[in-house]
């Protein structure tokens, strides 16, 4: 009989923990949840206090049988799933499904995978916290109710196969509203005036000092008048102020701040950051990665202090205690930090090393002294004028935490870097001026959200929790309500007036403005679904309501509220809204926009959501003749497309001519513009316009695709037509019966025989679950 069985969530964690505990302990993994609500059924008995109907998925049944047998033969079962609500629910499901007994079942938690933390957890077991379980169950059931009841409404009113979620829908609303703010934004111009003054330095050498007018000038005429007033004027140092400035280090990382900073500094997506953090945690390098706490343990602060003294000296040490400001913080008891502060670097992939370095620096910085700076501001008066210029300089007296870490920010602005030193100045000093430049600048529209800034906004609104940010952002993109992309900048004209040697020069320049990278854009489907839900289910889309639901989950977790009564209150209001909305009949399809009339047929022209996305339509379903449809082009929006642009779409597909005796045509499909020749689709490059592409250009694209296909297909076998050796993005591989298999680097693909291919497939199929190289092939796109 096995003395002790420990069950954790992941196999990687199991191997590490088994080494710490020794031969009396066997550690197995549950691979996450072992049961859940039934996928294709509602699975909630509303009339019986919202009783959930759980099932063990088919792919977990063998695992559950193994865990049952091992638990039955163990003297003590230790449930060691993660310490958040999700982890507590996993422990409870294991207890229920494995039919464990209270007398020999112990619940243990730890927020780092180190020997001392594991042994301490074994010494301090506790019972399963049913309040945390109920909070998780309430979230799961409420989200199932919303998704299961709203989705059919969307299928009937908007488009089949759409789905809705409580937190996801609010995230989409934020992105839609920001997009509309951007489109509604009216740019205002004003002139920013800067001057270069020539000032002697300590050696008497003339150096340039830049200063800026303290106000913006609204019009070109006013700017010109100001420069004219500066001709022959005297510029004098009216005042000099010097003040000390302290900069305090930011708190250690929570889940959301790590996601934001990793995006800014490393360019990682939210999902990528969480995947890497999970690996670091399971390898024992960092503490638990789903947390909204900024606290550090005494062990961490002492370790930080020792590391700082060793590397930088005692004057850099300033132990601090940070308080968690997030209301309802509950996911863990400590911030994300390295398990051992003396480990400045780790072994791992390049991405893991970068993320660890970021976490280490942020943690160390939080326990370091303030940065001490000195800021000097000189005010420069203009004779005969009330306006003044100011010149600002900043010098670091003691770098403190800046020695290791500088926080990044999302918003770019036009502020000058003040970390320059001003030359020696004295009050009353007259200044010789060089050029004075009035540059036309423009107010900036609100920026689109990045994944990181969306996480920050959700956290500010109290929506979601550390465990939900990454799944929310992934889900809204997978459902094609939002897409992440880049936007090319637009050329803009701006005016510059320069006063130099008593002469004013008037010039126009151009600049590229509005370029954006990796931003979140709402799709037409996302906009239509958002507008529909906002109109008919305002509560679900209300920020305060969604945040209040999170607070109610917190109250359940703290034992201050009954989860069933909260479910009842919600359902009694929500369910009638669903039934009422289904009963409403609308004249037009939800989201349909009438653009005008087709001048040829006299029929109405509209845009709406079709089966494969937004389409333009001529005519209606009531006409004798079937309506004509045209797929909208990428970059076009249902909200902004004009009648003329919609009519242009009906010129596609168009025939370009013949090539090799077959017709060549160009059109726009579900995946964008294409050339079609002999039943083969070729995607158009980004710069190519389907309305202007020539037959010669299309022929070149056809030949390029053929060449790529020839390079892709390395080898076939007549006796086994389903097996082929292909050259893919990550190198050569075997494809066979819908699955892909890696070819080892030391093997030349062309030298493989059918027999050796089948042997490679057999070896890879026999590998343990979770380590197999076999992958299902994705369906091909046109």
Predicted feature residues:
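Basic, low-complexity terminal or inter-domain segments flanking catalytic cores
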Residues: 2-5, 16, 25, 151, ...
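Short active-site loop/helix that positions an aromatic residue
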Residues: 16-20, 92-93, 172-179, 361
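C-terminal or mid-to-C-terminal helical accessory/interaction module adjacent to the motor/catalytic core
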Residues: 113-197, 242-246
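Metal- or metallocofactor-binding catalytic centers and their adjacent structured scaffolds
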Residues: 217-253, 426-432, 439, 544, ...
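Short acidic, hydrophobic short linear motifs in intrinsically disordered regions
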Residues: 237-241, 248-262, 287-291, 445-457, ...
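A conserved hydrophobic secondary-structure block that centers on an alpha-helix together
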Residues: 259-261, 265-272
